[in-house]
């Protein structure tokens, strides 16, 4: 009897949520108010992190900016302040260091308050084939792109759970859903970030903390210094995404409390095809679009800190 009741309840919920999703396809969700929210953005010193900071500043949020690049972070701080009377706090933080994340997190709690929207955006790209990637760069990719999410969530999630109010945002990648040639360390670290964020979303649902929202973002390559030189065979068919376009999409997804955001929508087709066609057909599609060779001309953004690290290692 219980199985019959459970089945009836399941189909009832399934039908309700299906109809609800159809309604929201036609009628946009009501966007939440983020004024007064304390928003922490990692990797805020440039690119997507900077643009997201500007969006939140325009809507009255208090900004907490983290980046290892202090100069870039202060420039973001300056741009944010141009939006008017905005509370903004900038901190230098190496997100690959658990000790430093916890230390700076304690400083934020003391000086600003409990973070209510956490955006794990910091990321690094090596852009080398697996056999040509030094061990320390593999570790760096995982520490920044995935493991740092564990430390930031450990630091700020307890207060959200206690208040049953908050929002976790994971900036993963389309490379966190589909493996890409030349991005073995980056892709696997983004798979890890996606898996962690999705598991955490389910954990929060199971403990009935439904007011702590999750948004998991998987964009195609963005036109930033991080993917400098990256291109496909037919840029008009599969172009790199503009930063402002992606930032606006992410900001809207947060305001609408959307759980999954994959950009562009063409990527949904690729994910569907991955499930139904043979690996050889997927490889043929990648060759046609030039995705398999997109990293061949990659140059990337080489930071001073990375150059210094490389020099020190060679001297040892």
Swiss-Prot record:
UniProt binding sites for NAD(+): 40-64
Pfam families named in the record: adh_short
Transmembrane segments: none
Highest taxon above the source species: Eukaryota
Active site: 186
Binding site for substrate: 173
CDD domains assigned: 17beta-HSDXI-like_SDR_c
GO molecular function, one term: oxidoreductase activity
EC number: 1.1.1.-
Enzyme class: oxidoreductase
Keywords: NAD, NADP, Oxidoreductase
Similarity comment: Belongs to the short-chain dehydrogenases/reductases (SDR) family.
The protein's name in its UniProt record: Short-chain dehydrogenase/reductase family 16C member 6
């Amino acid at each position: 009897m219980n199985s019959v009741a459970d089945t009836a309840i399941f189909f009832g919920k399934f039908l309700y949520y299906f109809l609800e999703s159809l309604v929201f396809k036609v009628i946009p969700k009501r966007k939440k108010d983020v004024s007064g929210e304390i928003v922490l953005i990692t990797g805020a010193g440039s690119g997507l992190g900077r643009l997201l900071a500007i969006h939140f500043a325009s809507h009255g949020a208090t900004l907490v900016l983290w980046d290892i690049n202090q100069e870039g972070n202060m420039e973001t701080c300056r741009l944010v302040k141009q939006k008017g009377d905005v509370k903004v706090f900038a901190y230098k933080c190496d997100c690959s260091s658990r000790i430093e994340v916890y230390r700076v997190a304690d400083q934020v709690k003391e000086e600003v308050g409990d973070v209510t929207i956490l955006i794990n955006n910091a990321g690094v790209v090596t852009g080398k084939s697996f056999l040509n990637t030094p061990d320390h760069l593999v570790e760096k990719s995982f520490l920044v792109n995935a493991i740092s999410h564990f430390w930031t969530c450990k630091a700020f999630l307890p207060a959200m759970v206690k208040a049953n109010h908050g929002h976790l945002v994971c900036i993963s990648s389309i490379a966190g859903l589909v493996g890409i040639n030349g991005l073995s360390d980056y892709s696997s670290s983004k798979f890890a970030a996606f898996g962690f964020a999705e598991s955490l979303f389910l954990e929060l649902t199971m403990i009935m903390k439904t007011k702590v929202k999750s948004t998991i973002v998987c964009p195609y390559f963005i036109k930033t210094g991080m993917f400098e030189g990256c291109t496909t065979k037919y840029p008009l068919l599969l172009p790199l995404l503009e930063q402002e376009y992606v930032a606006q999409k992410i900001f809207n997804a947060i305001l609408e409390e959307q759980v999954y955001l994959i950009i562009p929508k063409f990527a949904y087709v690729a994910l569907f095809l991955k499930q139904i066609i043979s690996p050889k057909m997927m490889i043929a599609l990648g060759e046609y679009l030039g995705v398999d060779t997109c990293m061949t001309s990659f140059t990337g953004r080489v930071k001073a800190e990375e150059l210094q690290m490389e020099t020190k290692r060679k001297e040892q």
